[in-house]
Amino acid sequence: MQIRLAVRLAFRELKGGIRGFRIFLACLALGVMAIAGVGSLSEALVSGLNSKGQSILGGDLSITMMHRTLNADEEKWLQARYDISSSNEMRSMVRSSQAEENAETDQMRHALVELKAVDSFYPLYGTLRIKPAIDPRVALGLQQPKSADGNENVNYGALVEPTLLETLGIEVGDTIKIGSGFFPVTGVILSEPDRLSGGFSIGPRVLLNEAGARHSGLYQPGSFVENNYRLRSIIPLSEGDLKAAKVEMNEAFPDAGWQIKERTDASPSLRRSIE
């Protein structure tokens, strides 16, 4: 009897152990599948970054300079090898004066924004999508429409992200104040091709043309301005060619003090987050 009881208890323990082991195996399989899935997703995202590197960076190469622009020698050297689009960025306050119904005074609303001024070649890669669906160059005043007498109408338009409209309580067609300049909101930014390459952002984007930005009066000695130059190679460049071009630029101007990025690493911060 004691032997039978011992055998019966042993079989019961064995059955319970097998059930527990099955649960362990199931958990192990789920863990392996989860790790494999995350790895595959990470590889897909990194591959997407590499394939869209030109659009994300805005060029094959980019140059960033603080507090100064390219000098004549640097610009001439680069223009012989690349198509160039220049832009500059700074943070600024934007204000809107909106008259409320039955109010004696206007209600002042303001917001901190990421201000970006672009030239007529922007963007070299990708598409700047806005609403309404008009040519962004016209919306920014980079291509001025002609009046009846044949003269160009100077229009320093502003393109803004939707969140700024909500913050200021305005809509397309209203006017915003940036620095000492007033700018009509001519469109809403739906997609900015090189937005991811800029890294950390603390406010909505506002796009102006370079002449309009100077009209704002914000660009003064000591202003914290980041000057960017997107470069599109005249001939196709491989990954090795990009690295060689970067070395060539630094050797040609060793004291330039610029930061150069390649399309293969268009957004380092995003890549680190994914990996």
Tell where the protein language model's regions lie, with residue ranges.
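Membrane transport/envelope proteins' first extracytoplasmic loop
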Residues: 3-275
